[in-house]
Amino acid sequence: MEVIKTNIPGVLIIEPRVFKDSRGYFFESFSQREFDDKVTPILGHSIHFVQDNESMSSYGVMRGLHYQRMPYTQSKLVRCVKGAVLDVAVDIRKGSPTFGQHVSCLLTGRDEEGMKIAEQFAKVSVQKRIW
């Protein structure tokens, strides 16, 4: 797994190690051990995911801006399994030096890339393509 920092602390791009051959491909979509080894040092604290959600949107549908208020905030690990989606994380943390700034990432079912979004960020996604 490769972890790529963005211009906003708390938002990371996650690229899994993918094994491809003539039969198809395989990769670990999540490993707590690897996440702890590679992401925790960057964030400065550990994260333990307790919920896994999946959604499907028709072409052009925009979902968001959504977020959770304290004490129910959630960190997110987002990826696209089919088609393409533009995912955007917006810093809405009051007093943050990056308040109001955003990071966008085009996630596709072809590259297995994901985006880690910190707590207290708003998120929006737009379905770009369905394969």
Predicted stretch roles:
Residues 1-111:
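Non-catalytic, conserved peripheral segments adjacent to functional cores
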Residues 107-131:
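Conserved metal-binding segment of the jelly-roll/cupin
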